C-alpha cells in the first residue's frame, strides 16, 4: 500500500488539545505601522526607572561635584563633553532597546486558513505555540513576561523592560557598551578627584561640604564599579553570542543547530547592519538585516 505524504502541524508542548488549528481565534487586526512597543510589566518599568536614575545621579556628581568646581577649564570641558556624550548614547540605546519590537511573532496566526496559505510541501512541519496561539518561526521562543513568541530571543532583560531578540539586540549591545564606558570614565575621574582633594584643601575641591563630597563620590564609585563589571560581562556575552550565532536560550537548552553556519563577520553584520559603518555605534541607525520569514521546518 502506498502512503500519501502529509503535512505536519506540531505543538511545542506536545499537548493533543492544542493540535487543532481551529482552536485558535483569528489574528487581531494589525496595529498601525511603526506603533510603539512597550511592555507593561511592573518590575521591568521599575528597573528601567532605576537605570535612568542611576545614570542621572552619575551625571549630577560628575558635573556638580567634580567638573564645575575645577579650576582646570580644559579638563572640565573635555571630560564634560565625553561623559555627557556617552551618557546620552547610553540612554538613547536604552530607549531603543526598550521601545523596539524585539521580533514578536504575530499573535493568534495559527489558524487553519493561514496554515493552508503557507502551501507546505511534503515533509515540512510548522510549530505552534499554545500560549499565544502563534506559528513559531525557527529559533523563536515564548516569553512569559512579554506573553509573545520572540524571534531569536536571547533573554528577557528587566533593565530594559523588554526581550532581547532579533530586532533590538544591536541596541542592547550598545547600551551595555556605553554604560561600561561611562562607568569606567566615572571611576577614573573619581580617582583623580580624590587625589586632587587630598593634595588640596577639601573645602576648595568641591562646592559641597567635605563629608557630603566624600559620600557622593563613594556612592558613585560603588555604582560605577558594580555596573562596569556587570555590563562588561554582559557585553562580552552578547558579542560572543552574536559571533557564534547562538542565543542565550539556545546555549542554555543545548538546542540542536538546524541553521546554516556563517562566519563571525557575517553574524556581526546580520545584527548591526550592512555594510560596516559608524552606524554600528549609533542607536539611531536601524540595521538593514534582510531577514527571512521562515515558518517552515524540514524534518
From Swiss-Prot:
EC top class named in words: transferase
GO MF annotation: an example: protein-cysteine S-myristoyltransferase activity
The entry's keywords: Acyltransferase, Golgi apparatus, Lipoprotein, Membrane, Palmitate, Phosphoprotein, Transferase, Transmembrane, Transmembrane helix
Consequence recorded when altering residue 61 to R: Loss of function in calcium transport
Biological process according to GO: lipoprotein localization to membrane; peptidyl-L-cysteine S-palmitoylation; positive regulation of receptor localization to synapse; positive regulation of synaptic transmission, GABAergic; positive regulation of toll-like receptor 9 signaling pathway; protein localization to photoreceptor outer segment; protein localization to plasma membrane; protein palmitoylation
Disruption phenotype: Homozygous knockout mice are viable, fertile and do not display overt phenotype. Male show a modest reduction in body weight. Zdhhc3 and Zdhhc7 double knockout mice show a perinatally lethal phenotype.
Residues in the Lumenal compartment per record: 69-72, 193-214
Chief subcellular location: Golgi
Transmembrane segments: 48-68, 73-93, 172-192, 215-235
Tissue specificity field: Widely expressed, with highest levels in brain. In the brain, expressed only in neurons (at protein level).
Post-translational modification: Phosphorylation by FGFR1 and SRC probably regulates the palmitoyltransferase activity.
PTM sites of type Phosphotyrosine: 18
Protein family per UniProt: Belongs to the DHHC palmitoyltransferase family.
Description of how the protein assembles with itself and partners: Monomer. Homooligomers. The monomeric form has a higher catalytic activity. Forms heterooligomers with ZDHHC7. Interacts with TNFRSF10A.
The protein's name in its UniProt record: Palmitoyltransferase ZDHHC3
Source organism of the structure: Mus musculus
Gene this protein is translated from: Zdhhc3
Amino acid at each position: 500500500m502506498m502512503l500519501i505524504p502529509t503535512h505536519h502541524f506540531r505543538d511545542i508542548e506536545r499537548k493533543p488539545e492544542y493540535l487543532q488549528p481551529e482552536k485558535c481565534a483569528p489574528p487581531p487586526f494589525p496595529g498601525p505601522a511603526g506603533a510603539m512597543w512597550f511592555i507593561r510589566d511592573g518590575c521591568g518599568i521599575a528597573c528601567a526607572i532605576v537605570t535612568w536614575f542611576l545614570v542621572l545621579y552619575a551625571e549630577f556628581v560628575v558635573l556638580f561635584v567634580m567638573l564645575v568646581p575645577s579650576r582646570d577649564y580644559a579638563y572640565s570641558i573635555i571630560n564634560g563633553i565625553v561623559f555627557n556624550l556617552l551618557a546620552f548614547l547610553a540612554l538613547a540605546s536604552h530607549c531603543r532597546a526598550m521601545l523596539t519590537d524585539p521580533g514578536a511573532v504575530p499573535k493568534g496566526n495559527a489558524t487553519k486558513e493561514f496554515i493552508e496559505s503557507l502551501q507546505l510541501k511534503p515533509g515540512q512541519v510548522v510549530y505552534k505555540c499554545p500560549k499565544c496561539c502563534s506559528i513559531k518561526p525557527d529559533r523563536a521562543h515564548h516569553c512569559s513576561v512579554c506573553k509573545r513568541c520572540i524571534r531569536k530571543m536571547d533573554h528577557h532583560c528587566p533593565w530594559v523592560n523588554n526581550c532581547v531578540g532579533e530586532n533590538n539586540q544591536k541596541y542592547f549591545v550598545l547600551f551595555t557598551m556605553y554604560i561600561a564606558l561611562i562607568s569606567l570614565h566615572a571611576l577614573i575621574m573619581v580617582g583623580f578627584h580624590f587625589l586632587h582633594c587630598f593634595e588640596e584643601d577639601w573645602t576648595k575641591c568641591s562646592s559641597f561640604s567635605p563629608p557630603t563630597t566624600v559620600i557622593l563620590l563613594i556612592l558613585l564609585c560603588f555604582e560605577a564599579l558594580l555596573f562596569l563589571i556587570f555590563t562588561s560581562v554582559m557585553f562580552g556575552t552578547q558579542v560572543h553570542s552574536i559571533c557564534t550565532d547562538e542565543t542565550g536560550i539556545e546555549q542554555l537548552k543545548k538546542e540542536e543547530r538546524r541553521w546554516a553556519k556563517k562566519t563571525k563577520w557575517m553574524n556581526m553584520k546580520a545584527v548591526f547592519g550592512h555594510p560596516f559603518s559608524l552606524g554600528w555605534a549609533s542607536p539611531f541607525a536601524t540595521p538593514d538585516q534582510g531577514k527571512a520569514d521562515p515558518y517552515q521546518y524540514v524534518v
